[in-house]
């Protein structure tokens, strides 16, 4: 019989009860109101997302990367592993308790990535940081923006979907990037509307589904290229 999940820690958030659950010695879940946000045994798409976004930056200088969503730290760890020693990595995370978990019971998954000297944790909405960079322009832009949030860009995403993945949000993401910068987005499933939105905003788009068989999530690697075709 499988061991039951136990609640390790819990916080009340605007979106509901945020739980860290553990089963046995190695299995962890992060859930919100019972919905699984992260599973420590299903991390391939998050890792590939960061690898594809950051590998082209390995030999560049003064690299700046924004990561939206900390989760269990797998995405951040993959970014660190593929960036130069002088890179700056800004992580936007809404819930301080997630940072606490990544320094505590989840620290071994990412080799304590949150404490890497290249990393700056900001307790804020990633959309606010993107808007700031887009507004301020040169000197504030990123080489890559990695969005690894549990909702993703699908049409049914509650609440935050539009302002993170809508026309204006995608245009803002493009403005927040340096020339040739990458806008990398995790998605639960393929979303042709979102893919077309990226292309219309002036991105070349590479869609991948890491893994083989079973449920495979989607990563969009969108590179800033031509001028936007959008009106908004």
Language model segments and positions:
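Active-site beta-strand termini and strand-to-loop segments that position acidic
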Residues: 22-23, 222-225
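Glycine-centered, phosphate/nucleic-acid-interacting loop/turn motifs that mediate DNA/RNA or nucleotide
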Residues: 181
């Amino acid at each position: 019989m499988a061991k039951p999940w136990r609640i390790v820690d819990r916080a009340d958030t605007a979106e509901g009860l945020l739980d860290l659950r553990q089963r046995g010695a190695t299995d962890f879940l992060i859930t919100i109101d019972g919905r699984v946000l992260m599973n420590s045994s299903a991390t391939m798409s998050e890792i590939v997302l960061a690898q594809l976004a950051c590998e082209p930056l390995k030999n560049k200088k003064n690299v700046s990367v924004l990561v939206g969503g900390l989760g269990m730290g797998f995405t951040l760890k993959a970014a660190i592993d593929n960036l130069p020693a002088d890179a700056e990595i800004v992580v936007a995370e809404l819930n301080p308790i997630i940072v606490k978990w990544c320094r505590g019971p989840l620290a071994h998954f990412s080799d304590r990535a949150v404490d890497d000297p290249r990393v700056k944790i900001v307790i804020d909405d990633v959309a606010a940081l993107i808007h700031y960079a887009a507004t301020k322009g040169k000197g504030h832009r990123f080489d890559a923006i990695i969005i690894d949030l549990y909702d993703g860009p699908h049409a049914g995403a509650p609440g935050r979907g539009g302002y993170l993945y809508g026309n204006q949000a995608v245009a803002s993401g493009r403005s927040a990037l340096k020339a040739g910068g990458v806008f990398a987005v995790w998605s639960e499933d393929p979303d042709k509307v979102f893919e077309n939105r990226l292309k219309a905003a002036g991105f070349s788009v590479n869609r991948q589904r890491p893994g083989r068989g079973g449920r495979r999530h989607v990563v969009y690697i969108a590179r800033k290229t031509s001028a936007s075709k959008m009106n908004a």
